[in-house]
Amino acid sequence: EIRVSLVGSEMCIRDRLDHDWIQKWMPTDGSVIFEDLTNSTGVLVVAGPKARDLMQKVSTDDFSNENFKWLTAKKVNVGYAPVNAMRVNFVGELGWELHHPIEYQNHIFDKLMDAGKDLGIKPFGIRAMNSLRLEKSYKLVGTELSIEYSPYESGLDRFIHPNKGNFIGLEALNKWREKGFDNKLVTLEVHNTKDADVLGNNPIYKDSKVVGRATGGEFGFRLDKSIALAMVKPDFANVGDKLQVDILGEMYEATVLDESPYDKENNLLRA
């Protein structure tokens, strides 16, 4: 039995893009079952240098690095709640996503907050998570990952193996590759920002000519830099290239950075 969990953004769920696409290509012999669990499943994220200490306080399962490696998942308990714990997160720190039946959410949250008092636990929201994910160049469905861009443009090259056999979209993707791509996803440091950072859809310039647009941005407090992700023309996507970005009608200098400027080697995630 193969079980697949798909956690989509609000936009994709609302527009039913994932839902309709999966149903379109599902086999009709009953070998695959598709069920929307949006209203019955919740997710809480535990992340930070003391995440393992906290999880060991609320669960009888072993969260050691040897027993629970990065990019793996296990069924565990948190208090009285059954949880599908995944050692991944969207903030770039040691941590776990805790997927659970929604009726256990308050119990899990209270358990984590009570056990984490002496560890300095604090709740954080989606805007904080957005800032943290940008420091890692993590891509968001609906912005950096969308039907508007090819997976090559969005920096998903390592997940594409066109020589391993046919798959849905391969023919169209090969034609796209032959034609050439119009965009490349880059991470930018925006210099000398004042009271506003890139929010998204900001035009990107090179010598007064529009060469792309920002898909998102925030101030990165771990890096102490204003960070943005942007789709730009490939000729201007090299590390070190100097560009300009429009924020509320004012131009700011920006530099193309190497991907994942915070903890590039993922040492914290692997800790």
Give the residues covered by each predicted segment:
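Single conserved hydrophobic/aromatic residue that forms the stacking wall/gate
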Residues: E1-I13
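A generic structural motif
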Residues: G8-E10, W96-L98, K225-V232
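Short beta-strand segments
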Residues: S9, A47, E189
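Flexible loop/turn segments at secondary-structure boundaries
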Residues: D15-L17, E93-L94, Q105-H107, R133, ...
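Short, conserved charged micro-motifs
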Residues: R16-D18, R52-M55, Y104-K111, A196-L199, ...
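Glycine-rich, acidic
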Residues: M26, S31-R177, F181
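Glycine-rich, small/acidic residue-mixed loop/short-helix segments
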Residues: Y149, E153-A271
